[in-house]
Regions:
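Hydrophobic/aromatic beta-strand patches that form the interior of the parallel beta-sheet core
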Residues: 28, 70-72, 86, 136, ...
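Acidic/polar active-site rim loop that often engages polyanionic ligands
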Residues: 25, 143-152, 223-225, 244
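NAD(P)+-binding Rossmann beta1-loop-alpha1 motif at the extreme N-terminus of oxidoreductases
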Residues: 1-50, 54, 106
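Rossmann-fold dinucleotide-binding core
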Residues: 112-182, 186-190
Length: 295
């Protein structure tokens, strides 16, 4: 397995492509948008430059990593030689089902189809394919080149052989794979998202401000960043999508998204990606200035 196709050139997609390419795999990075592919490659290059400056890789290794990546806007062309496809599109069930139908038609029998979904049922995604035994969850953490964990989620029909292959493959990437069961949110987001949502509720209810909430969690709980800063980093739209999946999946009110989160997403305040969330990122990507709405 030396050829890997990655669907989606956004934050997770380009991070996954970077990780595979740096580990010596030939990567076909696929996105319907030429602009997204351009931005994805720029992000990969910037991250590699940072690694060179920190002397964690050499200039030659940077060039080799970039040479391992080829871009495509056509799924059929992009997956032609792939032994594994990793889908990393937006966390939207309808979009993912559409992509997996396309992949099932375009990929030869025996090719493993993985999804980077952070909350959606692997069994449901696999149901639109003719190879549910070859569909698996491979949930990387952001930023992918740095974070060690990969949640490996087997659907109802995922085979033992495919699961072992992906577990072993994750280790060759320098990751630590953890196998979890196919329930909404899996492990990482089932625990993380209610905490972020409760932090937003705390702000919404006027218990404390942005600075105070994040400071309590950073200094009191030794978290590297506060929950509101983390929500901005993940993307408030992503947080909302995951909470909606969990709320629909469990029908438990504890997963219901805070009205403030819903309103912010509707207003286009998505965090770092949009330039504003709980913090203002118009001058810096660092959470140094609280957004005007919350001052």
């Amino acid at each position: 397995m030396k050829n890997v196709a990655v669907i989606g050139a956004g934050t997770m997609g380009n991070g996954i492509a970077h990780t595979f390419a740096q580990s010596g795999f030939r990567v076909q990075l696929i996105d319907v948008s030429e602009n997204a592919l351009k931005k994805g490659l720029e992000t990969i290059t910037k991250n590699l430059d940072r690694m060179v400056s920190k002397e964690t890789i050499t200039e030659a290794q940077k060039k080799e990593t970039l040479s391992n990546i080829t871009t495509f806007t056509n799924i059929t062309e992009g997956v032609e030689y792939a032994s594994l496809v990793v889908e990393a599109a937006t966390e939207n069930i309808d979009l993912k089902l559409k992509i997996f139908k396309q992949l099932d038609e375009a990929c030869p029998e025996g090719i493993i189809l993985a999804t980077n979904t952070s909350s959606i049922s692997i069994t449901q995604i696999a149901s639109v394919t003719s190879r549910p035994d070859h569909v698996i969850g491979m949930h990387f953490m952001n930023p992918v080149p740095i974070m060690k964990l990969v949640e490996i989620i087997r659907g109802y029909n995922t085979s033992d052989e495919v699961t072992k292959t992906i577990m072993d493959l994750s280790k060759t990437l320098g990751k630590i794979p953890v196998e979890v069961n196919d329930y909404p949110g899996f492990v990482a987001n089932r625990i993380l998202m209610p905490m972020l949502n409760e932090s937003i509720e705390t702000l919404y209810n006027g218990v404390a401000g942005v600075f105070e909430i994040d400071t309590v969690m950073k200094l009191g709980m030794a978290h590297p960043m506060g929950p509101l800063q983390l929500a901005d980093f993940i993307g408030l739209d992503v947080c909302l999508s995951i909470l909606n999946v969990m709320y629909e999946g469990f029908k438990n009110p504890k997963y219901a998204p805070c009205p403030l989160l819903v309103n912010m997403v509707c207003a286009g305040k998505l965090g770092i990606k949009s330039g504003e969330g709980f913090y203002d990122y118009s001058e810096s990507r660092k959470a140094e200035k609280i957004a005007k709405q919350f001052q």
